[in-house]
Structure formats: structure tokens, C-alpha cells
Amino acid sequence: MRIIGIDPGLGRVGYGIIEIQNEKKKFLDCGVIETDKNKKEEDRLYEIFNDLNTLINQWKPDIAAVEKFFFYKSSTTISVVQARGVIMMVLASKNIQVSEYAPSQVKLTIAGSGKASKKEVIEAVMFNLNLNYAPKPDDSADALAIALTKLNEAGIN
């Protein structure tokens, strides 16, 4: 079974891909889809659509875990919600089951505290996936943490 974790955003979408073999977690890939801030918003959303489709076709995940978005009073709120909509549409078009997790739930599951720092989350991701390095950029580490949250929920520790 393969899972893709996704940390939504307009400028940067973090992703992390983990495979389960014989109840053991295996890190496959992580990174970000970056969009050009000088492009029009619709072009950036289309870039996310294309790049996520390419990732899905390459790695063929069975399930997905996506960070839930909560409304904040920010000028980027609408853009992030639109990017998340594109992400959900791509996953639905590929018939990939999606689970959603609040940031505090991810932190609690992975690092033991809903208020864990970014550093604590990254260290927990490294420990859980037996990595010798911190996934970069942070958005990719967040995406791996989101995927690990789903696996934990499924009883795969």
C-alpha cells in the first residue's frame, strides 16, 4: 500500500510518499510543487493540477492524507482554499480515498503534543521513517507527518 501526504498551499504544496511492506514503513519520496508567484492565480492552480497529476501517475498511491484548512483572517485564505480544492479534485479524479487531519491532530499523533514545534515534528518524522536527514523544505516534512498520521490511525506504527 502507498500513501501520499499533502500539505496544501498556493505557492508551495508539500508532498510525501510512504509505502507499507509487511507492516513496515518505507520512505519513497518527498518534495514540493512550487508555483511562480509572478503568474496569475489561475495559472498557478493549473500548475498544481498538472504537477500533482504527474506525481500521482508516477507513484500510484492507494490512499491520501491531506491537511485540513481552518479559516484565518489572512489575504491568502482564499488562495489556499482554491489550491486545496484543486488537490481534492485531482485525488477524486484518480479514485483515491482521502483522509483529512487538522494540524494539531498531526502534531499530537506524530510528536505527542498538539502544540509541538516544527523542529519536534521534523525529528518525529525522521525517527518514524528512520531517516538520517531532515526532509526539506519543511512543507515536505509536514506532508510526511500528515501521511504518518493516517498510517497511525490505520494501526501501522
UniProtKB/Swiss-Prot annotation:
Any one cellular-component term (Gene Ontology): cytoplasm
Q: What is its EC number?
A: 3.1.21.10
The UniProt record gives the binding positions of Mg(2+) 1 as: 7, 139
Looking at the record's lineage, which domain of life comes first? Bacteria
From the UniProt record, give one GO term of the biological process aspect. Answer: DNA repair
- Its EC top class is hydrolase
Give GO MF terms, alphabetically: crossover junction DNA endonuclease activity; DNA binding; magnesium ion binding
Location comes to: Cytoplasm
Q: One of this protein's Pfam families, by short name?
A: RuvC
> What residues make up the catalytic site?
7, 67, 139
Its quaternary organisation is: Homodimer which binds Holliday junction (HJ) DNA. The HJ becomes 2-fold symmetrical on binding to RuvC with unstacked arms; it has a different conformation from HJ DNA in complex with RuvA. In the full resolvosome a probable DNA-RuvA(4)-RuvB(12)-RuvC(2) complex forms which resolves the HJ.
Q: Family per UniProt?
A: Belongs to the RuvC family.
What's the protein here called? Crossover junction endodeoxyribonuclease RuvC
Species for this entry: Prochlorococcus marinus (strain MIT 9515)
Lineage, uppermost ranks: Bacteria, Bacillati, Cyanobacteriota, Cyanophyceae, Synechococcales
